[in-house]
């Protein structure tokens, strides 16, 4: 287990789940983001990486990537509204490039410097 994985595991769950075809944050997702934003406010040198996925039947690769980007940007916007500078948030839209786990998700990774 890497240092990053150890640090991320302290904030379980570290994944936002989305309804199929949707990029709207659920109340549960907002609660998770609230915990991460509180931690980022304390740890001013830490950064957040958002890795977004979208996997659905009959969804083309380009549409999956657009949907995953929309999900990542929803999470990013929520963090920014909670006082986290945009320069501390990295977004990766990976579309349907997942081999394990829930395909409709955003993984949250806290990166400590």
Task: Give the residues covered by each predicted segment.
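Broad hydrophobic/π-residue packing in well-ordered secondary structure
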Residues: 17-21, 39, 53, 63, ...
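Short glycine-rich, basic-tinged beta-strand/loop micro-motifs
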Residues: 44-58
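Periplasmic peptidoglycan-binding/tethering modules of Gram-negative envelope proteins
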Residues: 1-47, 105-113
């Amino acid at each position: 287990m890497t240092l990053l994985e150890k640090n991320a595991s302290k904030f379980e769950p570290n994944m936002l789940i989305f309804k199929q075809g949707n990029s709207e944050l659920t109340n549960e997702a907002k609660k998770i983001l609230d915990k991460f934003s509180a931690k980022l406010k304390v740890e001013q040198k830490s950064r957040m990486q958002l890795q977004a996925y979208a996997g659905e039947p009959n969804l083309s690769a380009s549409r999956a990537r657009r949907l995953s980007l929309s999900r990542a940007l929803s999470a990013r916007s929520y963090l920014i509204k909670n006082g986290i500078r945009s320069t501390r948030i990295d977004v990766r839209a990976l579309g349907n490039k997942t081999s394990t786990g829930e395909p409709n998700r955003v993984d949250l990774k806290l990166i400590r410097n």
